[in-house]
Amino acid sequence: MRILYAEDERDLNDLVTRRLVAEGYGVDSCLDGQQAWDYLQAADYDAAILDIMMPHLDGLSVLKKLRAAGKTTPVLLLTARDAIADRVAGLDSGANDYLVKPFALEELSARLRVLTRSQFGAGDSRLVAGDLTLDTGTRRVKRGGAEIVLSAREYALLEYLMHNKGIVLSREKIENHVWNFDYEGGTNVVDVYIRYLRKKIDDGHERKLIHTVRGMGYVLREETP
């Protein structure tokens, strides 16, 4: 899942970004509201976390622009102000949730999970490819009924492949989504993690799901053995 995080306190921005990446999210982070709005215009996100008090453009203004543009991206607002009027203003502007600083990282993670579950809906939380299932709500992966334990990065890669089942994804797209890298070529991080996933997902199964498309990238699809 791809998350936008906008927070002008650099230390907090770095801390939260590291936490979300460790949990398997792809994260674009920025330090002011104008950058946040630029990101939101350029890409679709599974959720956005916006601080209210930011330079150039405050979080409420970003949120209003987002809703005026017809985008339904789930938004969690962050603020140091706990006044009821501030909460009402945020919710009236289209926020899905509201978190007051200082907050525990565990609470932020829990609220983000609720937001992303709500976006996909209870009936859409399971991604399926053959006998492979991934539950985005519980973050559990099974193949043939057997549970598969994945690292946070392996999970993020598999989720991206399954969301794009049948679509060939270039190394550049995978790096940008899963690692938040600006692709420069020469790195083999995608190939390494594809090998990790194949060992856990495909080894021991006659029907392989993760395929290499020479010169193009990788695709997850069902093929007859």
Where are these regions (language model features)?
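Residue-level signal for beta-strand positions within conserved beta-sheet cores that form or flank
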Residues: K71, G123, G130, E206, ...
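Intrinsically disordered, low-complexity protein-interaction/activation regions
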Residues: E222-P225
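Positively charged, aromatic-enriched patches within helix-turn-helix-type DNA-binding elements
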Residues: R140, G145-L209, R214-M216
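CheY-like receiver
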Residues: Q119-T138
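Conserved A-loop
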Residues: M54, T136, R143
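Glycine-rich nucleotide-binding loop
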Residues: Q35, G215-V219
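N-terminal/domain-start alpha-helical segments
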Residues: M1-A122
